[in-house]
């Protein structure tokens, strides 16, 4: 039975991928810094490892693996470029080197659409769009560099592919879903520009579907080898529709407050200045990058991922919101 290594399995996406692999009978090893007791209880192995630390430790953690799903990353909108580079570029370079050292045949990398979002509207872009991350986002800059490393590593011994899931949400999400709900409960949620711009998020099960398809389809010389693919639900909707859908699932009223894009951008600039001045490490309520993201459209064509990986995005937005509401009712998350 093949051994699949999953990095970042304590996170929302990595954990969901690991559970799906275990459910279908794969041998799974979770490699990361924090323990994953819930996944160990399901049969996963666990190796504690700082992927940006010593190369020898990373090589040992990947020993015996047939495939690696590299999901681990430092995400978010706050932190130094050096912090993001260490977690996202250095760690990825060491994962690639460890794959080569151990003769791993397949590497699936979790990237982000932010690698092509320079700050303006992105409507219906496909994978021919050049890498052009917004320099205001250390995360996007570091992920673009890491994706480039992964795609360049594709050769006759190691097949690689990068996936770019967009705005992952669903039960258990501590980022997008949890922040929308928390800010609404605190009376701090605003729709930038009225929430009219189109976005296309990814329900968690669809993100998992794409990763498992990539794992199964990826071989040396396969159509997907060396490529990157956008992943989403395939249902662009106004931002307010998704936001208010999440609020309704949590039993909260829709967001009726808005803020002009220019005002959000100025607020972000001021908060960034204050945060830098105080040396704070927590994320500000607004940054210039977030203001740009919320004030622009960003949705992508899925023709390539459907053609090469057989991706369907089986859970549509309405069904995802129904499942989210059920989760809030039963577990509160």
Regions found by a protein language model. Give the residues of each.
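NAD(P)H-binding glycine-rich loop region in Rossmannoid oxidoreductase-like domains
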Residues: 44-90, 98, 118
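Amphipathic terminal alpha-helices
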Residues: 3, 300-308, 312-333
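Catalytic helix-loop patch of NAD(P)-dependent Rossmann-fold dehydrogenases
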Residues: 90, 121-168, 189, 197
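N-terminal Rossmann NAD(P)H-binding glycine-rich loop of SDR-like oxidoreductase domains
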Residues: 4-24
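Substrate-positioning beta->alpha
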Residues: 145-146, 174-179, 193-217, 226-230
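Conserved Rossmann-fold NAD(P)-dependent oxidoreductase catalytic core, especially the SDR/UDP-sugar
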Residues: 94-138
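Conserved C-terminal active-site "lid" loop/helix of NAD(P)H-dependent oxidoreductases
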Residues: 204, 244, 267-312
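Mid/C-terminal beta-alpha module of Rossmann-like enzyme folds, strongest
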Residues: 217-284, 322-325, 333
